């Protein structure tokens, strides 16, 4: 997918980031059941299906009704789609047993950015919606019209890493009571103009509204909460040898993914210090349950062809068998 920002030219539409690398890392047995947690416009799903044998299966998830409609064009008995967040995969797949791999391609897709009515981009005039699932939840405009100044500042600071969050929040709240053309912010252009006045210094090559739009999108869609829930669900669903492949587009996402994988790959580092000081064998400490298989970035050719891929980071991990234990509960040496 992609971060919020520059509009796509027609040549850049529907370009799936790290397509071959992600599918190579994900599919290790052609008869396995796989999960594409973010169908989008189906780039990864179609490539996974091409790798599967007749007994393989792919279950995709997406919040976006437009993605669900696109999934309907795939006529393959091995494929099914769930209109839900990938955070719900544990409940939705409870009767299918373990899976061979889970792919999460985070962020927002080019078609979502480029459709003005969705309200994701400051470069297109449109209603300030920002919901990935337009059938439920409140819009960004509705939230900004009712949230207090402290909450708005917190969201913009924490999710947008915006140092002018307080000034932006003050301006948003003050705008509600302005006469004439004032009142609650309703459009992308309204918000972009307000932020441009509140942000005193500008980062080179970045619109001053970039961080605020990112923050509101993350908040409205509960993206980081969904990511944490989805990682836990994926881990529980994976069979031994199963692959977890996650593509992120900004530091907040990547930090969560990195910490989650590291906690399962190097649990001894996170063990209670008192436990680490106790006279125990290394085998008696928490044992790894994931193996880190690498961190990947798009190459120069992909970035040149698709500038939105520049910030992508892909992390891959493999589920390990639980350590065998003795009758007394300690791990066998």
Swiss-Prot record:
InterPro entries: RsmH (IPR002903), SAM-dep_MeTrfase_MraW_recog (IPR023397), SAM-dependent_MTases_sf (IPR029063). It comes from the Bacteria. It is found in: Cytoplasm. It is an enzyme of class 2 (transferase). Keywords: Cytoplasm, Methyltransferase, rRNA processing, S-adenosyl-L-methionine, Transferase. Pfam families: Methyltransf_5. GO terms for cellular component: cytoplasm. The keyword rRNA processing applies. S-adenosyl-L-methionine binds at residues 42-44, 62, 86, 105, 112. Disulfide bonds: none annotated. GO terms for molecular function: rRNA (cytosine-N4-)-methyltransferase activity. SUPFAM superfamilies: Putative methyltransferase TM0872, insert domain (SSF81799), S-adenosyl-L-methionine-dependent methyltransferases (SSF53335). It catalyses: cytidine(1402) in 16S rRNA + S-adenosyl-L-methionine = N(4)-methylcytidine(1402) in 16S rRNA + S-adenosyl-L-homocysteine + H(+). One of its GO terms (biological process) is rRNA base methylation. The keyword Transferase applies. Its EC number is 2.1.1.199. Specifically methylates the N4 position of cytidine in position 1402 (C1402) of 16S rRNA. Belongs to the methyltransferase superfamily. RsmH family. This is Ribosomal RNA small subunit methyltransferase H. It comes from Cupriavidus necator (strain ATCC 17699 / DSM 428 / KCTC 22496 / NCIMB 10442 / H16 / Stanier 337).
């Amino acid at each position: 997918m992609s971060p919020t920002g520059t509009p796509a030219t027609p040549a850049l539409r529907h370009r799936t980031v790290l397509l071959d690398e992600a599918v190579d890392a994900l599919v290790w047995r052609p008869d396995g059941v796989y999960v594409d947690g973010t169908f989008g416009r189906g780039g990864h799903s179609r490539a996974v299906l091409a790798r599967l044998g007749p007994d393989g299966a792919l279950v995709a998830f997406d919040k976006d009704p437009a993605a669900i409609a696109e999934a309907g064009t795939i006529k393959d008995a091995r494929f099914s789609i769930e209109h839900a967040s990938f955070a719900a995969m544990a409940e939705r797949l409870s009767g299918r047993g373990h899976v061979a791999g889970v792919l999460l391609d985070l962020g927002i897709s080019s078609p979502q950015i480029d459709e003005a009515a969705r309200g994701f981009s400051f470069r297109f005039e449109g209603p300030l919606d920002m919901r990935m699932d337009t059938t439920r939840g409140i819009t960004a405009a509705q939230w900004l019209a009712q949230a207090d100044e402290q909450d708005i500042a917190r969201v913009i600071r924490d999710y947008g890493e915006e140092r002018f969050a307080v000034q932006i929040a003050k301006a948003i709240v003050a705008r509600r009571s302005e006469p004439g053309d004032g009142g609650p912010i309703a459009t992308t252009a309204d918000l972009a103009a307000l932020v441009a006045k509140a942000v005193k210094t500008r980062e080179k090559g970045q619109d001053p509204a970039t961080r605020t739009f990112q923050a509101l999108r993350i908040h409205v869609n509960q993206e980081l909460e969904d990511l944490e829930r989805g990682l836990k669900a994926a881990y529980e669903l994976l069979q031994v040898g199963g692959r977890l492949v996650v593509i992120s587009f900004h530091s907040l996402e990547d930090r969560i993914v990195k910490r989650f994988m590291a906690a399962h790959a190097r649990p001894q580092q996170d063990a209670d210090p008192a436990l680490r000081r106790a006279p125990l064998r290394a085998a008696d400490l928490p044992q790894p349950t994931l193996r880190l298989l690498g961190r990947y970035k798009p190459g120069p050719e992909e970035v040149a062809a698709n500038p939105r891929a520049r910030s992508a980071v892909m992390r891959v991990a493999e589920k390990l068998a639980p350590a065998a234990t003795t009758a007394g509960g300690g791990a066998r040496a």
